[in-house]
Amino acid sequence: MTQFQIECVESKVESSCNQYGRFIVEPLEPGQGITIGNSLRRVLLSDIEGSAITAVRIAGVNHEFCSIPGVKEDVLELLLNLKNIVLKSYTNEPQIGRLKIQGACKVTTANFELPSEVEIIHGTQYVATVAENAILEMEFKIEKGRGYKIIDKKQTENSIDFLPIDAIFMPVRKVNYMVEEIFLRNSEIKERLILEIWRNGSVTPQDSISQAAEVLLNLFNPFKKINFENTDDSTEQTEDKISQIPIEELQLSVRAYNCLKRAQIHSIGDLLNVSQEELLEIRNFGQKSAKEVIDALQKRLGISLPKRKTNKKEN
């Protein structure tokens, strides 16, 4: 088993919603760097769970193409600001947040009223500017999910007063990786994986990598216990069952049935040991009876008898 170390060599906050971390994974066997790096990158960007505002109901507003009295931003601008808000939900159930504020003031996420299960990551994120004596009142839905959720038009039609928002659930916004060769003292060649991760602050760098690894483990774990059926054995079992079927199941005429019985042909297995030519050699078994047997085998069991005798070699 490959033994390697994972080390965070750099961590910094580039902005309130953009945090950076750089990790080094080494030593890896040749070829493992790109395998691990590419797999982690894909999972970090698409499968790490996050939280987002998915819909909002604004007092006095029934569609997104309008303005709000006393508010600097129109509805579309407000929806965009809500879309970019970073928060974290500790429950899988949808939650409702609220805001009711009177101006004049600048509204930030610090003004939100949230349930105890939801945490605002950046309390200074800007939301809107409200004029003096104007009131901004709204409710918004908070949900957990993965990736990017585009507005569902059917769901929009069923929503009452709520304006849907394209939700960005991804806590990891960008991932880069590089692979370098390293040379050990014994001249052995190994690889070093350099992983760069940009996050929105709702998940720690350690948690993001840990969650990504967990997703990959769950994805590949079933392959450890996979059972491949032996198709040859199953085919043989099917053939054995067919061979044991009595010729009565073919529902032949009395003449054809009696001729086969006198020839010691009692089952489909016995019948499969003869060809069409050999059928005609049975006493009192004519062309009509042979055709009846051939057609019954094909129609009921999908089996065709060979036309001519086969040379059977004895060892």
UniProtKB/Swiss-Prot annotation:
<keyword id="KW-0240">DNA-directed RNA polymerase</keyword>
<comment type="function">
    <text>DNA-dependent RNA polymerase catalyzes the transcription of DNA into RNA using the four ribonucleoside triphosphates as substrates.</text>
</comment>
<dbReference type="GO" id="GO:0009842">
    <property type="term" value="C:cyanelle"/>
</dbReference>
<feature type="region of interest" description="Alpha N-terminal domain (alpha-NTD)">
    <location>
        <begin position="1"/>
        <end position="227"/>
    </location>
</feature>
<dbReference type="GO" id="GO:0000428">
    <property type="term" value="C:DNA-directed RNA polymerase complex"/>
</dbReference>
<keyword id="KW-0808">Transferase</keyword>
<keyword id="KW-0548">Nucleotidyltransferase</keyword>
<dbReference type="InterPro" id="IPR036603">
    <property type="entry name" value="RBP11-like"/>
</dbReference>
<dbReference type="Pfam" id="PF01000">
    <property type="entry name" value="RNA_pol_A_bac"/>
</dbReference>
<dbReference type="InterPro" id="IPR011773">
    <property type="entry name" value="DNA-dir_RpoA"/>
</dbReference>
<keyword id="KW-0194">Cyanelle</keyword>
<comment type="similarity">
    <text>Belongs to the RNA polymerase alpha chain family.</text>
</comment>
<dbReference type="GO" id="GO:0005739">
    <property type="term" value="C:mitochondrion"/>
</dbReference>
<dbReference type="GO" id="GO:0003677">
    <property type="term" value="F:DNA binding"/>
</dbReference>
<dbReference type="GO" id="GO:0003899">
    <property type="term" value="F:DNA-directed RNA polymerase activity"/>
</dbReference>
<dbReference type="InterPro" id="IPR011262">
    <property type="entry name" value="DNA-dir_RNA_pol_insert"/>
</dbReference>
<protein>
    <recommendedName>
        <fullName>DNA-directed RNA polymerase subunit alpha</fullName>
        <ecNumber>2.7.7.6</ecNumber>
    </recommendedName>
</protein>
<keyword id="KW-0804">Transcription</keyword>
<feature type="region of interest" description="Alpha C-terminal domain (alpha-CTD)">
    <location>
        <begin position="239"/>
        <end position="315"/>
    </location>
</feature>
<dbReference type="Pfam" id="PF01193">
    <property type="entry name" value="RNA_pol_L"/>
</dbReference>
<comment type="subunit">
    <text>In plastids the minimal PEP RNA polymerase catalytic core is composed of four subunits: alpha, beta, beta', and beta''. When a (nuclear-encoded) sigma factor is associated with the core the holoenzyme is formed, which can initiate transcription.</text>
</comment>
<dbReference type="GO" id="GO:0046983">
    <property type="term" value="F:protein dimerization activity"/>
</dbReference>
<dbReference type="InterPro" id="IPR011260">
    <property type="entry name" value="RNAP_asu_C"/>
</dbReference>
<dbReference type="InterPro" id="IPR036643">
    <property type="entry name" value="RNApol_insert_sf"/>
</dbReference>
<keyword id="KW-0934">Plastid</keyword>
<dbReference type="InterPro" id="IPR011263">
    <property type="entry name" value="DNA-dir_RNA_pol_RpoA/D/Rpb3"/>
</dbReference>
<dbReference type="GO" id="GO:0006351">
    <property type="term" value="P:DNA-templated transcription"/>
</dbReference>
<dbReference type="Pfam" id="PF03118">
    <property type="entry name" value="RNA_pol_A_CTD"/>
</dbReference>
